[in-house]
């Protein structure tokens, strides 16, 4: 994939929520994953997608210290922000079952993109308010609906 021009990005070693673990563990999660990927593909991995979209200024500092140049977040946005000179790039979630027509709607509808940003902010607030319980509640709800 890499030879065909795909960007190989890191995501963390074990997909932990980076804001829920110690900064020492954050560094381990990121550097271990980065080193592992670089060994496999034989070139630098300079891009990361933050697991679960959860980060803080301290986490971002470690991301940069580990050597990442571009940082993808889960924040729905068309704007590129910067943190200590590095790009923070938001994105819109396109899942395996997202239809092409829905992608076109996201691209062409500012109203839909605004709604998606509001949804993101509401869920972000819920994650912050519920802490580690957010993911447990979310998993329980998803399991219930998947069974239906």
Go through each PLM region and give its residues:
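Histidine-centered catalytic micro-motifs
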Residues: 7-15
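Conserved alpha/beta-hydrolase fold motif
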Residues: 8, 47-48
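C-terminal active-site subregion of NodB/CE4 polysaccharide deacetylases
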Residues: 3, 20-47, 53-148
